[in-house]
Amino acid sequence: MNLLQICDKVWSQACLSACAPDLEEKLGRPVPSSSVLGTISSYYVQRYGFHPGCQVVAFTGDNPASLAGMRLEEGDIAVSLGTSDTLFLWLREPTPSLEGHIFCNPVDPQHYMALLCFKNGSLMRERIRDESASCSWSEFSKALRATEMGNGGNLGFYFDVMEITPEIIGRHRFNAENCEVSAFPRDVEIRALIEGQFMAKRIHAEGLGYRVMPKTKILATGGASHNRDILQVLADVFDAPVYVTDTANSACVGSAYRAFHGLAAGAAVPFADVVKLAPQPRLAVTPTPGAAQVYEALLPQYAKLEQRILSQTRGPPE
């Protein structure tokens, strides 16, 4: 991937020359990920009993395979809410950035995918739960339901370990007048955490070229995806419905889907048509009416405050 000019789908001659002589000949020509490369090596036939007619479909990495396994479509997002939070994005026009990773789309050669990782995920949520909700997820959820969308203009940044995106550490709280404060009431603290986590995800996704579309849907996985009230905030911030799935090992499932796609005439048949009979995700929540207006006003403010914190911690940009 790092040697590929992803827009032109050819190897970068400058990168090849920097790595090794005659590397292009050794690598071979890049091909669409649905391409059948040939039949399996006789070694695997003799050693492991593969059928000699077994065909090999072009390889991909675990993250692109996960996008295939979750069957994302244009405009969709997958959010893994675990120890670290991870976003998979389907992009039409990427904007490469140091903050995330841009890949060729594994199921549509004309489009792209992006990956964003956030280190302060479930452990940060658990810490605020312990501090502000008596170690109870039930109390945590009650606080989210008791506070209004937008949190009265109170915004928070919660990074107990150095964050990847953005590169900030510490807790920073701002009231509705954009003044930094030392603490929030417990319910406000809980909503500030969850809203802040999801606003950061949307802001940095849009920084890579992502845009929410009318048909956008969000697929949530990971431990926090079992909490409906957390998912409600996610749906409200992105103004898109959130679905959940029981599919585990999405990279393995995606590899199987891709193999099936490759054998079904490859790019001539849309990937979505090949997997349309697979189990569908379940709708968990839909956006609250009026959410779009609330967060359209708050998202730019959150982005400005993030830049303020960054400038205070590492100085103004040159």
Predicted segments with their positions:
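A conserved helix-loop-beta module that forms one wall/lid of the active-site cleft
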Residues: 20-35
